[in-house]
């Protein structure tokens, strides 16, 4: 017996559709800006020295240590002879201020006594600071 197999023709395969386009790649985000560095603070201005009246002729001044706040004349090294200081009246001859071996700082007793003629109110706290390293027997009167 002969089998006849009828081959069914398959129609033509149509063209393959075009491949779709790939989507566009998104843009990468922008990098944020780095923060600004703050400005460094300004250094404060040094205090102003108040006005000094008039100083007349001064003879010779030896070595002056540190002048503290004027208002009380704090730590003075050695003063030679002072002639006249302008409108403050006269200061006679002041000898040598007593120096201490431990600190090298002095507060002359007569300068503290003369503060009344300068219209200077004594500031005991400054006096204590200036003489805090001195022993009791070394401190000038008024401190």
From Swiss-Prot:
Intervals holding G-Q-I/R/S repeats: 11-13, 14-16, 17-19, 20-22, 23-25, 26-28, 29-31, 32-34, 35-37, 38-40, 41-43, 44-46, 47-49, 50-52, 53-55, 56-58, 59-61, 62-64, 65-67, 68-70, 71-73, 74-76, 77-79, 80-82, 83-85, 86-88, 89-91, 92-94, 95-97
Region of interest (29 X 3 AA approximate tandem repeats of G-Q-I/R/S), ranges: 11-97
Up-regulation conditions: Expression is regulated by the hypoxia responsive morphology factor A (hrmA).
Protein name per its UniProtKB record: Subtelomeric hrmA-associated cluster protein cgnA
Gene Ontology biological-process entries: cell adhesion
Gene Ontology cellular component list: extracellular region
Written domain comment of the UniProt record: Contains a tripeptide G-Q-I/S/R repeated region and lacks a canonical secretion signal.
Alphabetic keyword roster: Cell adhesion, Repeat, Secreted, Virulence
Entry function: Collagen-like protein; part of the subtelomeric hrmA-associated cluster (HAC) containing genes that alter the hyphal surface (such as reduced total chitin or increased beta-glucan exposure) and perturb inter-hyphal interactions within the developing biofilms, resulting in a loss of vertically aligned polarized growing filaments. Consequently, this hypoxia-typic morphotype (called H-MORPH) with altered biofilm architecture leads to increased hypoxia fitness, increased host inflammation, rapid disease progression, and mortality in a murine model of invasive aspergillosis.
Renumbered residue ranges of the record's region Disordered: 16-49
Disruption phenotype: Impairs the formation of the hypoxia-typic morphotype, increases surface adherence and reduces the hypoxia fitness.
Keyword Endoplasmic reticulum in record: no
Domain Collagen-like: 11-68
Gene behind this protein: cgnA
A Pfam family reported for this protein in Swiss-Prot or TrEMBL: Collagen
Transmembrane segments: none
Principal subcellular localization: secreted
Subcellular location: Secreted
